[in-house]
Amino acid sequence: MKCPKCNSTHSRVVDSRHADEANAIRRRRECENCGTRFTTFEHIEMSPLIVVKKDGTREQFLREKILNGLVRSCEKRPVGYQQLEDITNKVEWRLRDEGQAEVSSREIGKHVMNLLMHVDQVSYVRFASVYKEFKDVDQLLESMQGILQEKNKRSDN
């Protein structure tokens, strides 16, 4: 690593710690030339994931888009931000575990809805109303009946 002060490439690691929920390593370094201390981060490099949208266009996967959609769906609901981060992480890892270079936006939405249903049903309906593009109240009611049936199945077991 180059020293930010003198550009020397000779430094020693003074301290190492996990960062970003163990997805990165934070290293405290000291330049052997000038003594300046600086911090570096080491992250896992992920292969790019491409999202194929409904209209056929392609764009790079951005986890922030999932998180922003979840935040909007969960406004004024008893859902913590960490829960939304967890859902986003699970969705991203599931997509990456599938090993595909491209994934449809529809597939992403299904993963999000499956996880969100078990966290908060009102937020699920809000998310589904945008994702499924309900045309009328009947479609919304159908979705809600599906939630009730799922809930009844779980309570029977």
Swiss-Prot record:
ATP-cone domain sequence ranges: 49-139
Domain of life: Bacteria
ZnF bounds (unnamed): 3-34
Molecular function (Gene Ontology), one example: DNA binding
Keywords linked to the UniProt accession: ATP-binding, DNA-binding, Metal-binding, Nucleotide-binding, Repressor, Transcription, Transcription regulation, Zinc, Zinc-finger
Pfam short name (any one): Zn_ribbon_NrdR
Cofactor note as given: Binds 1 zinc ion.
Cofactor names: Zn(2+)
Biological processes per GO annotation: negative regulation of DNA-templated transcription
UniProt xrefs under HAMAP family: NrdR
Task of the protein: Negatively regulates transcription of bacterial ribonucleotide reductase nrd genes and operons by binding to NrdR-boxes.
Protein name: Transcriptional repressor NrdR
Lineage: Bacteria, Bacillati, Bacillota, Bacilli, Bacillales
